[in-house]
């Protein structure tokens, strides 16, 4: 495996936020870092006055109803007396209603408590329609009724207390043996057809159309926007497209983005090392003005001193356009330049105006082309994975460019040559994900000690939380589907779905936790398993040595071009971008497997008792339910769900 590389950010995903829901009963910032809002910032609003004003308005409404219109000029003493009587009557009515309401609430609560206590003392069900049937033997009748009532009470208590929790011991020896037997028996059988194709014809109706424009170019006269994006290469890609939208929104000129160096990813690659700068500038020129660097008169400014540096602490996650118009635009007009540091997920997906959302898609799917060096090596990788295939996938020209896409096509292959298919699996099981998940994977005390030490070093906030708060147990996290799939669980999923033992499997991922020993289950059941390090020679990999971001792009290309793609963590940014790319350019012919981890976990917890046929049926049903052709849900990522009117056009 390659050295650790940024195919993901530190695992601050939607699943991670659900861990906090279990801890606090609500949402919050990821425990990887300090909370997004540590307190009032320069862009904060004081909410206390709003709450006070709301309460005052409510009280004022009641007093206004009682007192009537204070602006009425009542000079007639008769009218004044009448008004006083009406006010007194209203006050009395209000007090009576209020007291009656409190009496009713108290009576209701006391009656419920009394009924519950009486039921517990009697030991009878709350249902009143349990009547014993007439029976000539009174003794047997009493026995049957008592047994029935007792069983009913026990059923109620069990339902109330919940099912006894099943614990995970980290081993799947029984199921893995069943899987090996099933794969050996099924070597000459046909695979299920739905494995290699989209199950719904509706997918064919969606066509890419984010390249269409209906507005005039922006002159960018309000100032300059700079961004230094953090995270891995996939988080940086999202940040670039988001900052393009912000630049258009503020009528600003965008300076070519920079990428922040991280001690975790240890890659100094910049935008121009991965993406074609000239294509980026030219393709987006009808949308925004882009320059390679600041004008000379602005280069000498101390941006931090003048308050033009905006960090992720200053901007809430998924901030709405109104935030940028209210807080960032005045700063931009004042200082002529604003520099965003980090900019991870700092722009909401809804509500966003139609054309701005389309610009987001246009940037991601059209403006970001990889540099020729990466395109060429990516084409070599795909060609070998397809075993010199005689066809091109719909995504190939967009991934590696028309020039290198033709290289994938084997011109020597005859018309009867059948290209071999390959399955790409993104196995998100690096130590950072494993440690951050707080899950247990069967490694005993040694595993716990190693992961504790890793959290202390890389996730100090999370490590402190584990010491100061009661955290969800590993079993609870697994039941909720919050644990990443281990290699053993991933291979059981593939076998359960019906992938043949002969299937070529490409594994994307770096430094799988546990090393080759952990991958033993995968390689033993699927011997045709490969990685980019197996497929490419050392000479071909040499230009990318020590550049983890560029190596991650090769994984992206291999996954996006695969005949079928399986993700093991739906919150992964690489999986999200790959699946979106396949939807946008795949013409309804490139299936993606998204396991529902909560349901899959429930199946795996029965590993000691479940039969293989039942396991297969349940796994296939679980995955089949995730393959529906859905329009993008409100608030979800357009990069992952491009089937929406802003990104794609529906011809139905």
Swiss-Prot record:
Does the keyword Transmembrane helix belong to this entry?
Answer: yes
Q: Which UniProt keywords apply?
A: Carbohydrate metabolism, Fucose metabolism, Glycoprotein, Glycosyltransferase, Membrane, Signal-anchor, Transferase, Transmembrane, Transmembrane helix
Its Gene Ontology cellular component terms are: endosome; Golgi apparatus; Golgi cis cisterna; membrane; trans-Golgi network
**Record CDD domains:** O-FucT_plant
UniProt main location, coarse: membrane
- Keyword check for Transferase: yes
Q: Where are the transmembrane segments?
A: 91-111
Q: Which GO terms describe its biological process?
A: fucose metabolic process
The top EC class is transferase
Identify the EC number(s).
2.4.1.-
Topological category with respect to the lipid bilayer: Single-pass type II membrane protein
Biochemical pathway = Glycan metabolism
**Molecular functions per Gene Ontology:** glycosyltransferase activity
Q: Which residues bind substrate?
A: 426-428
Residues of this chain annotated as glycosylated in UniProt: 139, 169, 251, 464, 546, 607
Localization, per the record, is: Membrane
Q: Sorted alphabetically, which InterPro entries does this protein's record hold?
A: FucosylTrfase_pln, GDP-Fuc_O-FucTrfase, GT106_glycosyltransferase
Family membership noted in the UniProt record: Belongs to the glycosyltransferase GT106 family.
Concerning PANTHER family, the annotation shows: O-FUCOSYLTRANSFERASE 15, O-FUCOSYLTRANSFERASE 2-RELATED
The protein, known as: O-fucosyltransferase 15
UniProt gene name? OFUT15
């Amino acid at each position: 495996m390659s050295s650790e590389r940024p195919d993901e950010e530190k695992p601050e995903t939607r699943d991670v936020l659900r861990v906090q829901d279990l801890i606090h009963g609500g949402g919050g910032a990821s425990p990887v870092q300090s909370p997004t809002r540590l307190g009032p910032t320069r862009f904060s609003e004081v909410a206390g006055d709003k709450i006070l004003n709301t309460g005052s308005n409510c009280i004022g409404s009641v007093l206004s109803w009682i007192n009537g219109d204070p602006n009425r000029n009542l000079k007639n003493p008769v009218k004044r007396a009448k008004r006083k009587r009406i006010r007194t009557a209203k006050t009395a009515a209000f007090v009576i209603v209020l007291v009656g309401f409190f009496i009713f609430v108290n009576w209701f609560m006391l009656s419920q408590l009394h009924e519950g206590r009486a039921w517990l003392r009697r030991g009878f069900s709350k249902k009143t329609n349990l009547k014993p049937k007439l029976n000539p033997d009174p003794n047997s009748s009493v026995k049957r009724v008592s047994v029935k009532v007792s069983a009913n009470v026990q059923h109620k208590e069990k339902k109330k207390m919940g099912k006894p929790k099943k614990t995970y011991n980290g081993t799947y020896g029984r199921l893995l043996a069943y899987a090996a037997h099933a794969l050996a028996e099924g070597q000459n059988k046909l695979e299920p057809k739905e494995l290699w194709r989209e199950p719904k014809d509706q997918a064919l109706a969606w066509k890419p159309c984010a390249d269409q424009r209906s507005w005039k170019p922006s002159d960018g006269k309000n100032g300059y926007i700079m961004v230094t994006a953090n995270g891995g290469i996939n988080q940086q890609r999202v940040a670039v497209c988001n900052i393009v939208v912000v630049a258009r929104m503020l009528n600003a000129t965008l300076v070519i983005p920079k990428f922040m160096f991280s001690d975790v990813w240890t890659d100094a690659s910049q935008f121009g090392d991965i993406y074609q700068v000239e294509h980026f500038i030219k393709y987006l020129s009808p949308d925004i003005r882009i320059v390679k660097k600041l004008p000379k008169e602005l280069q000498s400014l101390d941006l931090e001193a003048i308050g033009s540096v905006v960090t992720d602490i200053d901007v809430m996650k998924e901030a709405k356009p109104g935030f940028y118009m209210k807080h960032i635009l005045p700063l931009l007009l004042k200082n002529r330049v604003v520099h965003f540091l980090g900019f991870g997920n700092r722009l909401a997906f809804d509500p966003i105006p139609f054309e701005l959302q389309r610009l987001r898609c246009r940037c991601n799917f059209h403006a970001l082309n990889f540099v020729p060096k990466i395109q060429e090596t990516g084409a070599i990788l795909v060609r070998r994975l397809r075993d010199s295939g005689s066809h091109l996938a719909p995504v190939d020209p967009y991934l590696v460019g028309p020039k290198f896409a033709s290289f994938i096509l084997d011109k020597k292959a005859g018309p009867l040559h059948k290209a071999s298919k390959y399955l790409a699996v993104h196995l998100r099981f690096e130590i950072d994900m494993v440690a951050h998940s707080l899950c247990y994977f069967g490694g005993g005390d040694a595993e716990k000690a190693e992961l504790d030490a890793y959290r202390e070093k890389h996730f100090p906030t999370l490590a402190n939380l584990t010491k100061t708060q009661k955290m969800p147990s590993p079993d609870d996290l697994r039941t909720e589907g919050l644990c990443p799939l281990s290699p053993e669980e991933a291979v059981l999923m593939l076998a359960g779905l019906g992938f043949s033992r002969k299937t070529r499997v490409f594994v994307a991922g770096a430094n799988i936790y546990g090393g080759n020993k952990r991958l033993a289950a995968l390689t033993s059941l699927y011997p045709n398993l490969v990685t980019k390090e197996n497929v490419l020679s050392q000479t071909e990999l040499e230009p990318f040595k020590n550049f983890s971001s560029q190596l991650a792009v090769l994984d992206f290309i291999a996954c996006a071009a695969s005949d079928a793609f399986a993700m093991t963590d739906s919150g992964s940014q690489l999986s999200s971008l790959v699946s979106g790319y396949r939807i946008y350019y795949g013409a309804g012919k490139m299936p993606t497997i998204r396991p529902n981890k909560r349901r899959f976990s429930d199946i795996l917890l029965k590993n000691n008792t479940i039969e293989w046929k039942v396991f297969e049926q349940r796994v296939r049903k679980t995955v089949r339910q995730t393959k529906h052709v859905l329009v993008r849900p409100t608030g979800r990522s357009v990069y992952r769900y491009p089937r929406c009117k802003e990104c794609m056009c529906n011809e139905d």
